[in-house]
C-alpha cells in the first residue's frame, strides 16, 4: 500500500467522520492477526503497470486479487466478512472471466454472501469518443461480501 493511498483513505474517513471507528493499517496485503471485516479494492485490470500511477489500475496476473482471496479466510475472525470491491471491466475487455473469479473464490474456501452492484455514472461511461466506450458502457462495479466456508 502506498503512503499516498493510505493518506487518501484517512482523508476520506475524516471527511465522513469515521476516523475513530476505522483503523487503517499499512501492510503488504494482510496485517497480523484476524479481523471482523477486511475490505479490498484491488487494481481492476490484470496487466503490467508501466508507472507508479498505473499500479492503482493494473494488477499483473491478478496477483493481488488472487492473494487477497487465498489469504482472506485465514485472516477473518469466525463470522467475519471480506468485502471485495471490483469492476467487471476486465471481463468486458476479455482480460478475465467471471468463471475465473468465481473459481478463485471457491478455491480459497470462501462463499459469496451477497453482491451489491452499481453502474458507473462518470463521464467515461457515456463518452462515445473513449476507445473503451463499448466496455465501459456495460461496466458494473460490485461489492462482493465474502465469508469463509
Language model features with spans:
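S-adenosylmethionine
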Residues: 3-145
Amino acid at each position: 500500500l502506498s503512503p499516498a493511498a493510505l493518506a487518501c483513505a484517512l482523508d476520506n474517513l475524516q471527511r465522513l467522520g469515521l476516523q475513530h471507528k476505522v483503523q487503517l493499517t499499512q501492510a503488504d496485503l494482510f496485517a497480523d492477526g484476524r479481523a471482523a471485516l477486511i475490505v479490498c479494492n484491488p487494481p481492476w485490470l490484470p496487466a503490467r503497470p508501466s508507472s507508479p500511477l498505473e499500479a492503482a489500475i493494473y494488477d499483473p496476473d491478478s496477483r493481488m486479487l488472487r492473494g487477497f482471496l487465498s489469504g482472506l479466510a485465514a485472516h477473518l475472525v469466525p463470522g467475519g466478512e471480506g468485502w471485495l470491491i471490483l469492476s467487471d471491466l476486465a471481463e468486458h475487455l476479455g482480460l478475465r472471466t467471471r468463471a475465473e473469479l468465481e473459481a478463485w473464490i471457491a478455491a480459497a474456501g470462501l462463499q459469496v454472501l451477497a453482491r451489491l452492484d452499481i453502474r458507473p455514472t462518470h463521464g467515461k461511461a457515456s463518452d462515445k469518443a473513449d476507445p473503451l466506450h463499448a466496455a465501459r458502457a456495460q461496466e458494473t462495479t460490485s461489492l462482493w461480501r465474502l465469508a469463509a466456508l
